[in-house]
Regions:
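Structural preference for beta-strand elements that scaffold enzyme active sites
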Residues: 50, 81-83, 132
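Histidine-anchored nucleotide/phosphate-binding helix
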Residues: 63-84
Length: 151
């Protein structure tokens, strides 16, 4: 049995993965990505690849944001839908901005605007190659969220 998840991909599929993860040291779920590129269903049931990145709004932009933006840009270019979770409740739990949710919310606004600029204002939405920002507080306000947590 071959343990290399990329072994079943053709050259085009391997090139796509190389472009998506250029510069990345570790890729979690590469087997799933390779399977979807090969035609299998994604976790959501279709053929759309989705990436989720959770970030705590906790301060000013720094060099690391540019590195992350480059990877996000690579994913968007390969038609991956990228969701950036602005983990505002995590910032609150971790005592950022003295647990002032108004300041944390302002930091989340700042963070999303900086990433829009770094990514040259990509199209936003739920489709292929689109970017979406969502706050943990928005998700937690959803009845679906709590239904899932309590099950």
């Amino acid at each position: 049995m071959n343990s290399n998840p990329l072994s079943n991909l053709d050259d085009e599929g391997r090139s796509k993965i190389d472009r998506m993860f250029n510069g990345c040291e570790e890729i979690v779920g590469i087997g799933h990505v390779a399977n979807v590129i090969s035609g299998s269903s994604s976790h959501s049931g279709g053929n759309q690849l989705n990436a989720y990145i959770g970030l705590e709004p906790s301060g000013k932009a720094h060099l690391g944001w540019m590195v992350l933006a480059e990877t996000i840009d690579n994913l968007l270019a390969e038609k991956v839908n990228v969701t950036v979770l602005l983990a505002d409740w995590h910032a609150w739990v971790n005592d950022k901005f003295s647990r002032d949710m108004e300041k944390i919310s302002l930091a989340a606004d700042y963070m999303s605007e900086v990433f829009r600029v770094l990514l040259n204002f990509p199209e936003e939405g739920d489709g292929p190659g689109q970017l979406r920002f969502i706050r943990a507080s928005e998700m937690m306000d959803s009845g679906k969220y709590w239904e899932r947590v309590l099950r």
